[in-house]
Amino acid sequence: MKNKENEVLNLTLNLTIIFLIFCNISIXIFKIDFTKHKAFTISKVTKNLFSSANETIYITYYNSGSLENYFAFPNQIKNFLISFSDASKCKVIYKEIDADKISTPLEHIGIPSQQIDLRDINQLSILKIYSGIEIIYEGKREVIPVVTEISNLEYDLANGLDKLINNTKKVLGLAFGDSTLKEAHKNFSEIMKKAFGIEIKEIDLKTEKLEDIRKDINGLFIIGAKEIDEEIAKKIDDFIVNDGKIFVATSTIDYNPQNPYGITPIKSSLFDLFESYGIKYNDNIILDKRAPTIFLGGNFQTYYPWILIDKSNIVKKDMPLLKNFYTATIPWSSSLELIKKDETEVKFLPLFASSKQSWQVKEPNLSNISLNAFEVPNKFEENKTKILGYAIEGKIKSPYKDQYSKNSKIILTGSSMIFSDYMYNGSPSNFELSGRISDYLMQKEEFFNIKSREVRAKLKFASSSNEMVNAKFSLIIVNLIILPTIILIFGLVRFTRKRKAN
């Protein structure tokens, strides 16, 4: 019986030692990702791109070596790119170059210098740095000009590889249903190209036929509705029922921030079209007590016509479009109302809403919005939220002819200023939403799911993350305490057994 107990103990100690040694080896050889959200695990989408590549992919990370003295992100990026290369099964050759040690300016390949203010970490200086990635495949080049975190790095790399390997073109049509809004969106095309690699093709709804350009664009953005008559509405309907993908940013109120007292309601055939589909645009502007604070008139003030959208007021939290989305600000928005029920072949998906402490302003009080934009009413009309965005998916029936779409995608928002230049300064995260909407319309869901994963990292000063500290501490405990202790016990047991045997 005693011999049997000794054998069991001996086997247990052997297996424990083997397991602990395996844990150490697996980190270096098998590249097992122990981070909470699998920060360094490459998705199936990217691996499929590797399989499609017929030639070697060259990825170079240019970064200033001095960065590592102040920030943690260069090492995070390097570790991620090493994991990226390992996952490619020799399809990717990765190298890093210290930008401080090369004489040729990186601007010539599209990687600009950045200035980082070090006063936040008690350094009285401003550091000029580079941190960008170059991808080369079959002599073609894609560049990620600025990289300071790994949260969206796989998405950016996969997009670049998709363009190089599959010759994918990302082109969005941009049409203004109100020509006066062009001035407020002068930078939109440039932002979309720089941030998401999306080409913008501007379309004149009055003169151009959408059926002629349907094959040239992946989706259509329409901003404003004031000048859309029934003839143009029919063009838009024809685009939709022929499976065109569309995003609409418009309000029922003609509001210009430069002329805040000249507020008038808008009548448009575009509203009639969407009402026939099942969504009504209400004649109001929504104000919300839970609005962001902005710098206006020399002071920081809570500006109630700007509605803060975050996890708390995202309605469809499981929808990939808004999964793991942070924040956006919806300015001067009308509310949207569902007037049809979900049907078997059509889904109506509410996206985001105001808070319960919100209120609406209608005629004849619209001109008072600017006067009362910083005042909260004593009581709210209703203790419920107002929907500010809807998605429609499925087979949509045209109100003008007997035709159904096969699989339409429409996103409607109640603000014509959501992606305006005002918001680029006031709420830059709005343009993260524009990129997500673009992917959604382009039916690049597989790429979109990369971006919908839990955030991998944030820009940090040169202090290791909690996960990294915990991992190092665990390895110290295993290697310096647990493993030696078990080996010592194993040796003592063997020694004791031999002495007794003798």
From Swiss-Prot:
<dbReference type="Pfam" id="PF09822">
    <property type="entry name" value="ABC_transp_aux"/>
</dbReference>
<dbReference type="InterPro" id="IPR055396">
    <property type="entry name" value="DUF7088"/>
</dbReference>
<dbReference type="GO" id="GO:0005886">
    <property type="term" value="C:plasma membrane"/>
</dbReference>
<dbReference type="InterPro" id="IPR019196">
    <property type="entry name" value="ABC_transp_unknown"/>
</dbReference>
<protein>
    <recommendedName>
        <fullName>Uncharacterized protein BB_0752</fullName>
    </recommendedName>
</protein>
<keyword id="KW-1133">Transmembrane helix</keyword>
<keyword id="KW-0472">Membrane</keyword>
<feature type="transmembrane region" description="Helical">
    <location>
        <begin position="10"/>
        <end position="30"/>
    </location>
</feature>
<keyword id="KW-0812">Transmembrane</keyword>
<keyword id="KW-1003">Cell membrane</keyword>
<feature type="transmembrane region" description="Helical">
    <location>
        <begin position="473"/>
        <end position="493"/>
    </location>
</feature>
<dbReference type="Pfam" id="PF23357">
    <property type="entry name" value="DUF7088"/>
</dbReference>
